From Swiss-Prot:
Residues 27-261 form the BAR domain. It is found in: Cytoplasm; Golgi apparatus membrane; Mitochondrion outer membrane; Cytoplasmic vesicle, Autophagosome membrane. This is Endophilin-B1. The lineage of its organism: Eukaryota, Metazoa, Chordata, Craniata, Vertebrata. Residues 156-185 form a coiled coil. It comes from Rattus norvegicus (Rat). Residues 305-365 form the SH3 domain. Homodimer, and heterodimer with SH3GLB2. Binds BAX; induction of apoptosis augments BAX binding. Binds DNM1, HTT, AMPH, BIN1 and ARFGAP1. Interacts with UVRAG; UVRAG bridges the interaction to BECN1 indicative for an association with the PI3K complex II (PI3KC3-C2). The modification Phosphothreonine is found at T145. One of its GO terms (cellular component) is early endosome. Signal peptide: none annotated. Its main location: cytoplasm.
Amino acid sequence: MNIMDFNVKKLAADAGTFLSRAVQFTEEKLGQAEKTELDAHLENLLSKAECTKVWTEKIMKQTEVLLQPNPNARIEEFVYEKLDRKAPSRINNPELLGQYMIDAGTEFGPGTAYGNALIKCGETQKRIGTADRELIQTSALNFLTPLRNFIEGDYKTIAKERKLLQNKRLDLDAAKTRLKKAKAAETKSSSEQELRITQSEFDRQAEITRLLLEGISSTHAHHLRCLNDFVEAQMTYYAQCYQYMLDLQKQLGSFPSNYVSNNNQTSGTPVPYTLSNTIGPSAVASTGSLVITCPPNLSDLKDSSSTRKARVLYDYDAANSTELSLLADEVITVFSVVGMDSDWLMGERGNQKGKVPITYLELLN
């Protein structure tokens, strides 16, 4: 027998087996043939494996979306991964925002309150960006990779053996059908022999599949450890971000902030929440409005007729002819006037004079 004859016979045998399985499967669907049912334990294991696969895929994909919301970036990373190449490093959103803030602060002037605050905010955003990058790397290594290994490795093996078990089951039921239809003694003997062989192969494949499926419990235990690692990575990330923002808030405590709810303003002048070396902790918020009490240096000025030099913290446009417009960083002369509202001083610049809000000023020694 030459190799070609052997290949032809093998091809014919394979075709016959495939046809036999197709016929058996079709007859089962039509209710014209009996089907060997798997034992309940094996069915439960198969169901558990399928459930694990479905939810692992969903969790894995949504975690990827959480860590990298940009779909184009995810596709790029996927392509590089398939090419077994490292994806080029890309700046993330917090880092980009931080760089914009730093550039803006530098252009506005690091010596100005707003420029200095922008630079500090930008540096914090870049630190958050670094923490974000570390979270992605740690989560990908300790959480996503094990999940992906299960989907692309263990479960593929399970699916392959499950498919093989299905084929062995079809072979077994086809052999049972042929035995039932056999009439001649010789045909019956041959069919019985075939049935014993297919039964043995089916039992063997069922055992192999069962052993693989029982490993799902170990998979769950492993994924639980990976989940703990992911939670720890998130905890570290959020703790870092909280600390960064806490430090930033403390640094910005010496800068003016123009935020006051429009609904709570009692005059046309915006009132900053805190001022460097001027308001400090004496600014307290109450329900419905922001109450500011003067620190000692301003109180002394109001209680006397003396004049002081003051540096303007940021620009102010006069609302009417009784007020004096201000430019950030300019130095003016200020003094109190009896009967004037406690939030205002009289400002003087050359021959110009008018009311100025005290919250826009830093008194100089």
